[in-house]
Regions:
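Membrane-engaging insertion elements
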Residues: 222-305
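Terminal export/targeting leaders at protein ends
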Residues: 1-204
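Generic intrinsically disordered, low-complexity segments enriched for polar/acidic and small residues
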Residues: 53, 60, 71, 110, ...
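Anaerobic metallocofactor- and corrinoid-dependent redox/one-carbon enzyme cores
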Residues: 2-34, 216-224, 242-245, 262, ...
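Transmembrane alpha-helical segments and their cytosolic interface motifs
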Residues: 180-257
């Protein structure tokens, strides 16, 4: 399995608390809601695409209201404290005291995927491994959903053609060619070819993880691709501006739709069991979000952002 080419050799070691403190307050508030409020787990209801889209807008409005409420109560340190208290099950006044429990919470998240931590593995190394398995799990779920709804394939391919810009398609095509995942004879990347590549290339994660090393622009294009795929599966239509104004991966993944997507596929099966739900949320929401935020910062720095 390919890894994102990001240097993790840092001194002193990066902690989860450090990473959370690097995130902006709104992102922290959105993450806190994702981890603690199960009322946003349900998909938007409706018999038609219009009804589902309208109900999604109501969910989005309520979600943003909850974020605003939290931001009126907590500043950054308070948000980090609330997140770490939820993640570890311990309560401390000084957020630095949560660091002693970080390995245990990562070990618990790793166990969701059957991962056993290796000797001499840093916290960031373990985060990366969890993130890789999260990606693999996500693509496997995508395959399962398309097997249930094969008629969606053409709709998704069309949506990719319409929403990805020419520049984004060129960026993706170049990386796919460099990795030998599509023929060098192809001059124009179509939505169908992109979707087939994501579904069939190795474990399904090689494309996703490998593209991350190609730069921030490609990373955003990739995220838009995944988001578009699942939006179509849910039968929701979003304004084109949602994708043209996206400036970072987390702006797509942490919003209410991202919350719904990942919860439906990954967390709902564990809702009836409180301990399993907590483990599922650590493995599919908490750790991947923190690592994605870290990746984004590294990629932005690499492009002089």
């Amino acid at each position: 399995m390919e890894n994102l080419e990001i240097n993790t050799n840092t001194t002193p070691p990066i902690t989860i608390v450090d990473q959370l403190l690097e995130m902006d307050e709104r992102t922290l508030a959105e993450l806190l809601i994702r981890c603690t409020q199960t009322k946003f787990l349900k998909p938007p209801k409706g018999k038609t695409e219009e009804e589902r889209t309208e109900n999604y807008k109501k969910i989005e409005a309520e979600f943003n209201q909850e974020v605003d409420k939290i931001l009126q109560i907590y500043k950054k340190h308070g948000l980090v404290k609330e997140l770490m208290e939820w993640a570890t099950g311990f309560t401390y006044d000084d957020i630095s005291h949560y660091v002693q429990h970080e390995y245990d919470l990562l070990k618990r998240a790793a166990g969701f995927y059957g991962i056993k931590p290796r000797a001499m593995e840093t916290l960031l190394d373990l985060e990366r491994v969890i993130f890789e398995h999260w990606m693999q799990y996500l693509i496997e779920k995508l395959r399962e959903e398309l097997e249930k709804h094969p008629d969606k394939f053409d709709e998704i391919a069309k949506s990719l053609d319409e929403h990805l810009t020419s520049e984004e398609k060129e960026q993706l095509l170049k990386v796919l060619k460099d990795k030998g995942l599509v023929s060098k004879e192809i001059s124009n990347l179509q939505g169908r070819a992109l979707l087939e590549t994501i579904l069939t290339a190795g474990s399904g994660t090689g494309v996703l993880l490998g593209l991350g090393s190609a730069g921030f622009g490609v990373y955003i294009a990739l995220t838009k691709t995944i988001h578009l795929i699942f939006t179509q599966l849910l039968g929701i239509t979003l304004p084109f501006a949602v994708y043209t104004t996206a400036t970072k991966t987390l702006s797509l993944l942490l919003g209410p739709l991202g919350w719904i997507i990942f919860s439906i596929l990954m967390v709902i099966p564990f809702i009836q069991h409180a301990r399993k739900k907590k483990t599922a949320l650590l493995a599919t929401v908490f750790v991947p979000t923190i690592y994605l935020a870290y990746i984004e910062k590294q990629l932005q720095k690499g492009e002089g952002a």
